Amino acid sequence: MASSNLFSVGRDCQLVLIGPSGRVDLTHVTGFEARQLTQQIRVTRLDGTNLGTNLPRGWEGEFEIERGSSAAEDLINQTEQNYYAGGAMQFSTLYQYINETDGSVSTWQYSNVVVRLTEAGVWQGDSGVKQKLDFFASTRQRM
């Protein structure tokens, strides 16, 4: 469904995480953030001219979720168990779908994704359990 706004809002974004064993259903994603990582190169030539470039070094970000299942913990458990069994680290793939204001859909693929559970949640009375996952991806490309 196209956005009813002249600008993007949070509900215009959908995320699909494909783990080493298939789709990871993160039930209630309440926030998502991604940042490009770069290595800055700065050069000052002898004539005083300053030049620069930014070399791509991957992407990082985070998911905020309201726990609706054990999916996030299961992904982390699978990664840990594989590591302790002497297995190779396995990567995930993340897809971000954005409903654009013109009615089109932009699809971004984050490749070679590694995930960590930075907040497993606080369990209190009748409160929801908020969790946070951080990720690193080698690349992000438009599909």
Task: Outline where the language-model segments fall.
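Solvent-exposed edge beta-strands and adjacent loop segments
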Residues: 2-75, 105-132, 142
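Short, acidic/charged, Gly/Pro-enriched secondary-structure junctions
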Residues: 77-108
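Short, structured patches in soluble enzyme cores that scaffold and shape functional sites
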Residues: 135-139
